[in-house]
Amino acid sequence: GASNVAANLSNLISEVKLYGELALDVSSDEVLELTKEHGIQCRISHSLNVTPVKTRFVGNEGQHILRLDVEIPNSKNRQIETPTEKILKDISVGDIVIVSDYNKGSIEKDTVQKISDITDLIFVDPKQEPEIYNSAFLVKPNMKEYLKWNGEFTTDSAIQFMNKHNWTWLVLTDGANGMH
Protein backbone atom coordinates (compact mmCIF):
# COMPACT_ATOMS: atom_id res chain seq x y z
CA GLY A 1 0.00 0.00 0.00
CA ALA A 2 1.70 3.13 1.27
CA SER A 3 5.13 1.49 0.97
CA ASN A 4 4.52 0.88 -2.75
CA VAL A 5 3.55 4.52 -3.25
CA ALA A 6 6.72 5.59 -1.41
CA ALA A 7 8.87 3.21 -3.49
CA ASN A 8 7.42 4.57 -6.74
CA LEU A 9 7.97 8.15 -5.58
CA SER A 10 11.57 7.40 -4.66
CA ASN A 11 12.19 6.70 -8.36
CA LEU A 12 11.01 10.24 -9.17
CA ILE A 13 12.29 12.43 -6.35
CA SER A 14 15.26 12.32 -4.02
CA GLU A 15 13.65 12.69 -0.60
CA VAL A 16 10.73 10.48 0.42
CA LYS A 17 9.57 9.97 4.00
CA LEU A 18 7.13 7.22 4.96
CA TYR A 19 4.89 7.52 8.01
CA GLY A 20 2.66 4.75 9.30
CA GLU A 21 2.11 2.13 11.93
CA LEU A 22 3.74 -1.28 12.23
CA ALA A 23 4.56 -3.75 14.99
CA LEU A 24 8.00 -4.85 16.13
CA ASP A 25 7.96 -8.15 14.23
CA VAL A 26 9.45 -9.97 11.22
CA SER A 27 6.91 -8.46 8.80
CA SER A 28 7.81 -4.91 9.81
CA ASP A 29 11.50 -5.79 9.43
CA GLU A 30 10.78 -6.74 5.79
CA VAL A 31 8.97 -3.43 5.16
CA LEU A 32 11.82 -1.46 6.72
CA GLU A 33 14.43 -3.33 4.67
CA LEU A 34 12.56 -2.70 1.40
CA THR A 35 12.18 0.99 2.15
CA LYS A 36 15.88 1.21 3.02
CA GLU A 37 16.73 -0.34 -0.38
CA HIS A 38 14.76 2.49 -2.04
CA GLY A 39 16.39 5.22 0.07
CA ILE A 40 13.12 6.03 1.84
CA GLN A 41 13.33 7.65 5.26
CA CYS A 42 11.04 5.70 7.60
CA ARG A 43 9.18 7.53 10.34
CA ILE A 44 7.22 4.48 11.45
CA SER A 45 5.35 4.34 14.76
CA HIS A 46 5.62 0.91 16.32
CA SER A 47 2.12 1.12 17.74
CA LEU A 48 0.62 -2.12 16.44
CA ASN A 49 0.87 -5.47 18.18
CA VAL A 50 0.95 -7.32 14.82
CA THR A 51 1.92 -5.93 11.39
CA PRO A 52 -0.81 -6.53 8.77
CA VAL A 53 0.36 -8.93 6.05
CA LYS A 54 -1.04 -8.97 2.51
CA THR A 55 -0.25 -12.03 0.39
CA ARG A 56 -1.00 -12.01 -3.34
CA PHE A 57 -1.47 -15.24 -5.25
CA VAL A 58 -0.32 -14.76 -8.84
CA GLY A 59 -1.03 -17.02 -11.84
CA ASN A 60 1.44 -18.16 -14.53
CA GLU A 61 0.68 -15.13 -16.71
CA GLY A 62 1.20 -12.64 -13.88
CA GLN A 63 -2.50 -12.09 -13.16
CA HIS A 64 -3.56 -11.64 -9.55
CA ILE A 65 -5.85 -14.50 -8.57
CA LEU A 66 -6.36 -13.82 -4.89
CA ARG A 67 -5.17 -11.54 -2.11
CA LEU A 68 -5.16 -12.74 1.49
CA ASP A 69 -5.03 -10.06 4.20
CA VAL A 70 -4.08 -11.09 7.71
CA GLU A 71 -4.44 -8.48 10.43
CA ILE A 72 -5.77 -8.06 13.93
CA PRO A 73 -8.27 -5.18 14.14
CA ASN A 74 -7.84 -2.71 17.00
CA SER A 75 -4.41 -4.05 17.92
CA LYS A 76 -2.98 -0.61 18.69
CA ASN A 77 -0.84 0.56 21.55
CA ARG A 78 -1.66 4.30 21.71
CA GLN A 79 1.10 5.06 24.22
CA ILE A 80 3.44 5.70 21.29
CA GLU A 81 3.69 8.83 19.11
CA THR A 82 1.20 8.62 16.23
CA PRO A 83 2.09 9.04 12.53
CA THR A 84 0.18 12.35 12.51
CA GLU A 85 2.25 13.68 15.40
CA LYS A 86 5.44 12.72 13.57
CA ILE A 87 4.30 14.28 10.27
CA LEU A 88 3.38 17.56 11.96
CA LYS A 89 6.88 17.79 13.48
CA ASP A 90 8.58 17.06 10.14
CA ILE A 91 6.75 18.97 7.40
CA SER A 92 7.32 22.51 6.18
CA VAL A 93 5.53 24.98 3.92
CA GLY A 94 5.64 23.66 0.35
CA ASP A 95 6.16 20.01 1.27
CA ILE A 96 3.99 17.49 -0.55
CA VAL A 97 2.10 15.08 1.71
CA ILE A 98 0.42 11.99 0.27
CA VAL A 99 -2.20 10.42 2.53
CA SER A 100 -3.05 6.80 1.72
CA ASP A 101 -5.97 6.21 4.05
CA TYR A 102 -6.90 2.60 4.70
CA ASN A 103 -9.42 3.50 7.43
CA LYS A 104 -7.40 1.67 10.08
CA GLY A 105 -7.35 4.56 12.55
CA SER A 106 -4.09 6.27 11.56
CA ILE A 107 -5.89 9.12 9.79
CA GLU A 108 -8.00 10.91 12.37
CA LYS A 109 -10.80 13.36 11.61
CA ASP A 110 -8.50 16.39 11.98
CA THR A 111 -5.31 14.96 10.40
CA VAL A 112 -5.70 16.63 6.99
CA GLN A 113 -6.77 19.93 8.55
CA LYS A 114 -3.70 19.96 10.81
CA ILE A 115 -1.42 19.21 7.86
CA SER A 116 -3.12 21.91 5.75
CA ASP A 117 -2.25 24.48 8.42
CA ILE A 118 1.39 23.89 7.38
CA THR A 119 1.30 22.95 3.68
CA ASP A 120 -1.37 23.14 0.98
CA LEU A 121 -0.03 20.24 -1.09
CA ILE A 122 -1.98 17.29 0.34
CA PHE A 123 -2.89 14.42 -1.99
CA VAL A 124 -5.39 11.89 -0.61
CA ASP A 125 -6.40 8.34 -1.53
CA PRO A 126 -9.52 8.27 0.68
CA LYS A 127 -11.42 5.56 2.54
CA GLN A 128 -13.49 7.59 5.01
CA GLU A 129 -16.15 10.29 4.77
CA PRO A 130 -15.19 13.24 2.54
CA GLU A 131 -15.31 15.86 5.34
CA ILE A 132 -12.18 14.30 6.83
CA TYR A 133 -10.27 15.46 3.75
CA ASN A 134 -11.54 19.07 3.60
CA SER A 135 -8.84 21.45 2.31
CA ALA A 136 -6.81 18.72 0.58
CA PHE A 137 -5.22 19.76 -2.72
CA LEU A 138 -6.22 16.58 -4.57
CA VAL A 139 -8.58 13.77 -3.55
CA LYS A 140 -8.64 10.54 -5.59
CA PRO A 141 -11.53 8.21 -4.70
CA ASN A 142 -12.66 5.42 -6.96
CA MET A 143 -16.06 5.82 -8.60
CA LYS A 144 -17.75 3.47 -6.12
CA GLU A 145 -16.49 5.55 -3.17
CA TYR A 146 -17.52 8.79 -4.87
CA LEU A 147 -21.05 7.54 -5.65
CA LYS A 148 -21.41 6.47 -2.01
CA TRP A 149 -20.51 10.03 -1.00
CA ASN A 150 -22.44 12.00 -3.61
CA GLY A 151 -25.04 9.66 -5.13
CA GLU A 152 -24.43 10.68 -8.75
CA PHE A 153 -21.64 11.61 -11.11
CA THR A 154 -21.89 14.48 -13.54
CA THR A 155 -19.21 17.05 -14.23
CA ASP A 156 -21.33 19.77 -12.59
CA SER A 157 -22.11 17.70 -9.48
CA ALA A 158 -18.43 16.76 -9.13
CA ILE A 159 -17.37 20.42 -9.33
CA GLN A 160 -19.95 21.37 -6.69
CA PHE A 161 -18.81 18.50 -4.47
CA MET A 162 -15.16 19.47 -4.90
CA ASN A 163 -15.91 23.11 -4.03
CA LYS A 164 -18.00 22.09 -1.01
CA HIS A 165 -14.95 20.32 0.45
CA ASN A 166 -12.43 22.98 -0.61
CA TRP A 167 -10.45 20.62 -2.85
CA THR A 168 -8.44 22.02 -5.74
CA TRP A 169 -8.63 18.76 -7.69
CA LEU A 170 -10.92 15.72 -7.66
CA VAL A 171 -9.74 12.72 -9.67
CA LEU A 172 -12.06 9.71 -9.93
CA THR A 173 -10.64 6.34 -10.92
CA ASP A 174 -13.19 4.24 -12.79
CA GLY A 175 -11.64 0.88 -13.70
CA ALA A 176 -11.82 0.15 -17.42
CA ASN A 177 -13.41 3.59 -17.97
CA GLY A 178 -10.18 5.30 -16.91
CA MET A 179 -10.23 8.48 -14.84
CA HIS A 180 -12.56 11.49 -14.63
How should these model regions be labeled?
Residues 1-52:
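Substrate-binding N-lobe of the ribokinase-like
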Residues 9, 97, 138, 142:
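Residue-level signal for inorganic ion chemistry
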Residues 10-18, 60-65, 141:
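Conserved thiamine diphosphate
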Residues 17-21, 43, 96-98, 123, ...:
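A structural signal for isolated positions on well-ordered beta-strands in alpha/beta enzyme cores
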Residues 43-49, 56-91:
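Conserved phosphate-binding/catalytic loop of the ribokinase/pfkB sugar-kinase fold
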Residues 91-106:
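Short acidic, glycine-rich surface-loop motifs adjacent to enzyme active sites
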Residues 106-180:
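Conserved phosphate/ATP/ADP-binding segment of small-molecule kinases
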